[in-house]
């Protein structure tokens, strides 16, 4: 696969989960899909509007008291802990609503999963609301970022102005 990043943005993504024999894939031209085992591929979309209470995915290893208080500002929610790229895929599949990432990641950790979630109608943005982008700085480290499906919710409000740019 050539040219997975165009204009500093992923345009295609593939995430495979060997333990469950599940593959998530998507592109801007063809939307997002999930393939489980030998089943036929199924089209997936982010959930809009977000569920109530919202399902927020995160990592236990990156939890801290400040994050807890920020999440409380979002209102009633269920926090589910899981592995890295799976968080993006749960959003792409419409099984989660928000993923705040305030810990270190590298571009290779996120580009494929971002391609899937954006193909499913989701957004991956930095603290200022601009899209997470690639290959345009000296470091391969990502700034803090947020993944969500429902753009009507004010997901970023509790995190803005708190120096969450890494």
Residue ranges and their predicted role:
Residues 56, 90-92, 111-118:
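Hydrophobic residues within well-ordered alpha-helices
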Residues 76, 101-102:
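A generic structural signal for short
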Residues 108:
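Acidic donor-binding loop at a coil-to-helix junction in glycosyltransferase catalytic cores
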Residues 60, 103-105, 127-130:
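Short secondary-structure boundary segments
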Residues 2-89, 138-166:
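Acidic beta-strand-loop-alpha-helix segment within the catalytic core
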Residues 84, 102-103:
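Beta->alpha turn/N-cap motifs
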Residues 93-98, 122-123:
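Alpha-to-beta junction loops
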Residues 122-137:
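Acidic, metal-binding active-site segment of PIN/NYN-like and related structure-specific nucleases
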């Amino acid at each position: 696969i050539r040219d997975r990043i165009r204009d500093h943005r992923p345009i295609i993504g593939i995430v495979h989960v060997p333990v469950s024999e599940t593959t998530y894939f998507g592109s801007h031209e063809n939307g997002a899909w999930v393939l489980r085992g030998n089943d036929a591929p199924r089209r997936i979309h982010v959930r809009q509007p977000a569920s109530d209470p919202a399902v927020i995915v995160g990592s236990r290893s990156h939890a801290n008291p400040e994050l807890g208080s920020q999440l409380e500002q979002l209102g009633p929610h269920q926090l589910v802990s899981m592995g890295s790229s799976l968080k993006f895929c749960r959003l792409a599949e419409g099984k989660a609503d928000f993923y705040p990432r305030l810990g270190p990641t590298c571009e290779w950790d996120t580009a494929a999963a971002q391609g899937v979630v954006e193909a499913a109608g989701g957004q991956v943005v930095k603290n200022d609301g601009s899209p997470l982008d690639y290959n345009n700085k000296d470091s391969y480290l990502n700034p803090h970022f947020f993944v969500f499906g429902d753009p009507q919710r004010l997901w970023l409000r509790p995190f803005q102005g708190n120096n969450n740019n890494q």
